[in-house]
Amino acid sequence: MAGYGRGFFGLFGGGGLVNAKVDTDKLAQKQDERLLTKATVVALDDAQDGSIILQGGANTYNYVGVESELLSVKTVVEEYQSMAQQPEIRKAVDIIVNDVVTCEEDETPVTVNLDKVEGISDTVKESITECFKEVMHLMDFDNTAYQKIRKWYVDGRQAYHVIVDPTNKKGGIKKLVMLDSRCIRPVYIVEKAMREGGIEAIESVTLKYYYNPNYNRNQFTGQSGTSQNFQPSQQELVFDDESIVYIDSGEEPLANGIVPGLLNPAIRPLNNLVTTEDATVIYAITRAPEKRAFYLDVGTLGKKSAEEYMTMMMGKFKNRNAYDRTTGKITGNAHLMGIAEDYWLPRREGQNATEIATVGGGNQLGEMDHVNYFREKLYDALMIPKSRLQEEGSINIGGSNLAEITQEELRFSKFCAGLRRRYSHFFMEFLRRQLILKGVTDEKDWNEKIKPFIKFEFTSDSYIREQQENAILNDRLASLNTVEPFVGSIFSIDYVMRNVLRMSDEEVKEQQAKIAEEKKKGLYPKVQADETGNYSGSDVSPLKFKPETLPFSGSTDDSI
């Protein structure tokens, strides 16, 4: 008789036969049902942070409260724009943008690379390349690449309105309009439904873009995006997902849900730097000149009469200068803080008579260590290498001290590469819509065959890039000469190609195919063999080229 077990099933089922037969079909069905009950979507993807979430069903949602959220974005963006006017920030932004994209004559700032795209014909690849050129022309990117990337970097967001002719969709995108980044914000419309157990499940999530250009005056600079007599719109506009291409900085959202810009870490260091610079200027001006000290003999005058006498004398000899921190000028405005005032001191009868003396100035006016400290903190917040701050220094492209700056420059290089990849989302979206509208491909092929493998290459400075590549190649060839005697005994040729020359799998296959192709074309010379079957100057190294030999014909002529 089979016994009862007290195992796993015994604990929860009150005991059961150990050898009882389990219905695997019913068990699997119950597990599937449990998975389905847990598969209800009850939360949004965390990747949707930084957007406004509205709840509604059908057309019941409204945009109450979105306007105030948009005003918060406007305030943040305007603060970034005001920061960009500071010389230190302007210099840092210029360094970063010039490293992200280089605008040289007769060169396109960005090109599309389809080398890794497989599964499509060469004709489709040519069409993709042509569509990408059309997108670059619509953006006028060849002429405005620096300005567009700089504006995206400063504002921390950028949006384009994609305009298509509804009567001729095959014509593709007709125009790309850059919208004011202060006036637009993504909004997710979430529709929920009540499920069993009282759980609110998310039925659908729709992306919209809320645009309100009515409040476009910059509260920091006072500038308005439009004329005072013209308002672009007196109503709130809501765009569909396919009408707008919107890219933010990609940073983690703040506590208020706003995605900060790339200048956000520099707010505090910049304020400290500006305050320190102003204090340094004020100290230098106040302590540099010798101030006058008036000692007035008031005799036996009463307190009130003495004060009136001093006030009258101060009016005659008043010397008051003020420093305007907004312009850096020295003015005589009375409402500003005085920085070089005279001293007026009364004297009673029996002491010395009226006297005018001087108070010595400061002797430590050249101390700038505190200013340089905050300037370095500012550039550290913006990921700028310290080597970029020395204007009088030369650019180190290679050499003995290359390793000393490699770590900092490598970090900056990766940072700029991340900015390029982030901004490339614009090209990806514009190209996708252009290809689908023109019928070059469909959504499925784009997502499966093109999008995962397409790359956008930004043009860098040609001279510096060439020198860097030459320096790297020379170092690798020097290492190759070092390990060459050990190839075949310790290292294989494949190891040398991949670990010494740092060639990728694609590069190894490509070079081997090119060598075989060039041999077939006869680009490598053939040499005359000697009596032993070898040729003069032969080398036993497996890494060096061995030309094909012609059979020995008894002649010492080495001509081919």
Swiss-Prot record:
<keyword id="KW-1188">Viral release from host cell</keyword>
<dbReference type="GO" id="GO:0019028">
    <property type="term" value="C:viral capsid"/>
</dbReference>
<keyword id="KW-0118">Viral capsid assembly</keyword>
<keyword id="KW-0167">Capsid protein</keyword>
<comment type="subunit">
    <text>Homododecamer. Interacts with the large terminase subunit. Interacts with the major capsid protein. Interacts with the capsid vertex protein.</text>
</comment>
<comment type="similarity">
    <text>Belongs to the Tevenvirinae portal protein family.</text>
</comment>
<feature type="region of interest" description="Disordered">
    <location>
        <begin position="526"/>
        <end position="560"/>
    </location>
</feature>
<protein>
    <recommendedName>
        <fullName>Portal protein</fullName>
    </recommendedName>
</protein>
<comment type="function">
    <text>Forms the portal vertex of the capsid. This portal plays critical roles in head assembly, genome packaging, neck/tail attachment, and genome ejection. The portal protein multimerizes as a single ring-shaped homododecamer arranged around a central channel. Binds to the terminase subunits to form the packaging machine.</text>
</comment>
<dbReference type="GO" id="GO:0019076">
    <property type="term" value="P:viral release from host cell"/>
</dbReference>
<keyword id="KW-0426">Late protein</keyword>
<keyword id="KW-1171">Viral genome ejection through host cell envelope</keyword>
<keyword id="KW-1162">Viral penetration into host cytoplasm</keyword>
<keyword id="KW-1160">Virus entry into host cell</keyword>
<dbReference type="InterPro" id="IPR010823">
    <property type="entry name" value="Portal_Gp20"/>
</dbReference>
<keyword id="KW-0946">Virion</keyword>
<dbReference type="Pfam" id="PF07230">
    <property type="entry name" value="Portal_T4"/>
</dbReference>
<keyword id="KW-0231">Viral genome packaging</keyword>
<keyword id="KW-1242">Viral contractile tail ejection system</keyword>
<dbReference type="GO" id="GO:0019072">
    <property type="term" value="P:viral genome packaging"/>
</dbReference>
<dbReference type="GO" id="GO:0099000">
    <property type="term" value="P:symbiont genome ejection through host cell envelope, contractile tail mechanism"/>
</dbReference>
